[in-house]
Amino acid sequence: MISITSAEVGMKINEWHRHIQKFNVTDAEMLKAEIERDIEVMEEDQDLLIYYQLMAFRHKIMLEYTLPSDENRMELSEYLNKIEGHKKKLDNMRAYYYNFFRGMYEFRNGEYTRAITYYKKAERKIPTISDKIEKAEFYFKLSEVYYHMKMTHISMHYAELSYNIYKKHELYSVRRIQCHFVIAGNYDDLENHEKALPHLQEALKGAELLKSKNTHIYATAFFNLGNCYHKMDNLNKAARYIEQALVQYRKINSDVLPQAYHDLALIYFKQGKKEQAMDCFRKGIRSAVDFKDELFMNLFEALDVLYIRNGDTPKLLNIFSRLENGKGYPYLEELALLGGNLFDYNGKIEDSIICFKKMVYAQKQISKGECMYEI
């Protein structure tokens, strides 16, 4: 049997990583299988095996993003357990990858402050990383988690760093589109929707070129435009874009379906289109149950309280309490604002004040998140 050097396998793992970064699932899967065959006949090298396990972990994160399933989530945990046993042996590069990929794992699980903790540890190793694309990937991931934590200016800083690298590399179109999403989302959080729109329109233009091979990003481009118009109170345009997003998300049975149905139901309720709202409401609850999405089960329950049962304050407060966690605070902020405005419109001033106080509480918890990771 012909032996192969660990250096040769290491080069293949680097190439595998490039396919993962580009979301080239088929090429990544083929190269992974080839590397696993090579490892069977490779000279013994424990460091290389750790590198392989790290990249296999990153590969699973990619699959869980593009093809969400309980099986992929379970395998992620298995890879993590294997890598944990080798932590003391990690050199600078592998320590960087370990903390970076672990941050991605925590982010996918909605543990945003834990994700930031690992990302900051990885950032200390960034000076040892010479590859520009690797740096762009890292900056993008930081921009993403800070966006979810509503740390807007920090997110914008990292998104700009990432985009300025990716725009010089034609092959990384998915990441360029995603940078536009994050930048636009930050502008929306700053209530500067007019600046968000050009980024979202540019993202849709790029996503249209990828629609045959990346339905998810194409759907998300419509969805984000719909959300922006929703924030601008242009409900007709918002509904049209989210309807188009739903068509695409249904094709791939995306785990974003509960959110898309929820947002469209909310828009229809605001427009007084009760029949369409109830249709989205029912479909959304079914999809939330199918995906075991507890967050959106709670948010659909809130829609029921606010728009179907015409306000049940104790029940709404109970839902608020379920959203008091790192992942839930941004949704709690928006829900409390929605409830406050609705109660105010209906003349329920005391209930409105309760909601607005809860909104301020959520904002404070989000701002505290910046200090919750280790320095």
Curated annotation (Swiss-Prot):
It is found in: Cytoplasm. Its EC number is 3.1.3.-. One of its GO terms (cellular component) is cytoplasm. SMART domains: TPR. GO terms for biological process: sporulation resulting in formation of a cellular spore. Belongs to the Rap family. This is Response regulator aspartate phosphatase E. It comes from Bacillus subtilis (strain 168). The lineage of its organism: Bacteria, Bacillati, Bacillota, Bacilli, Bacillales.
